[in-house]
């Protein structure tokens, strides 16, 4: 599910910006037949995170990490251009890991609405009608041509999860001014199912005042 090209681009932008963290994880797995440990890795930026088996980390992303950090970390570390590497306290790393583990509890399923507005924000909607927008650059972390991941949003709407087998991508949604909330809901209320079947989805729909939207996320590059 994780796009090699997309992840490398996001890592590069994060490294030049606010930095990112690399958190190796050893998880104990127990079954009736046997018990073993499996190695996972978490990559965590300001508004995104990726989690997968270490062996499934895209090769070029591993190369990018080695280039940025200077080596492949075996312990949690944060890295940023022109700054010394910061070793992460074990307690802090454990908290971040557990927070990601708990996000799925009480989460709701989302479906994509085929609208990209202002050339940047992809809309998703839950079964209860709540609508969220995600930066299309961060969505490039996911190879949607290869898989159709399960999409979920936390109960408070502060983090989305895209899940496929042992791979996970976490994204913070954007936030917009109250004035535009009704317009977002109007877009979501359109009969998208029939429009898609008729091969007539709306793309780059712009009902927003350029001076009024207030994105929560900052550009990664």
Residue ranges: model-predicted function:
Residues 45-48, 63-221:
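C-terminal functional regions that serve as terminal interaction/effector modules
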Residues 54-55, 135:
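Generic structural signal for alpha-helix starts
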Residues 1-52:
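Intrinsically disordered, low-complexity linker/loop segments enriched in Gly/Pro
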Residues 55-57, 62-64:
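Anionic-ligand-binding alpha/beta catalytic cores of soluble enzymes and soluble regulatory domains
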């Amino acid at each position: 599910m994780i796009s090699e090209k997309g992840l490398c681009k996001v890592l590069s932008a994060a490294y030049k910006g606010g930095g990112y963290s690399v958190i190796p994880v050893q998880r104990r797995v127990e079954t009736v037949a046997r018990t073993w440990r499996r190695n996972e890795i978490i990559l965590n930026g300001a508004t995104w995170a990726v989690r997968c088996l270490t062996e499934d980390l895209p090769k070029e992303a591993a190369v990018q990490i080695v280039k940025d950090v200077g080596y492949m970390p075996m312990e949690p570390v944060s890295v940023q251009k022109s700054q010394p590497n910061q070793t992460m306290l074990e307690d802090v790393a454990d908290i971040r890991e557990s927070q990601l583990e708990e996000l799925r509890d009480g989460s709701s399923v989302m479906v994509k609405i085929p609208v990209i507005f202002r050339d940047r924000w992809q809309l998703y909607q839950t079964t209860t009608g709540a609508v969220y927008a995600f930066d299309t650059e961060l969505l490039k972390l996911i190879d949607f041509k290869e898989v159709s991941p399960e999409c979920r949003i936390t109960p408070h709407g502060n983090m989305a999860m895209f899940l496929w087998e042992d791979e996970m991508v976490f994204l913070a949604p954007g936030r917009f001014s109250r004035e535009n909330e009704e317009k977002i809901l109007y877009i979501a209320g359109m009969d998208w199912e029939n429009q898609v079947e008729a091969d007539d989805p709306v793309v780059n729909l712009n009902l927003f005042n350029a001076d009024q939207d207030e994105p929560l996320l900052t550009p990664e590059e």
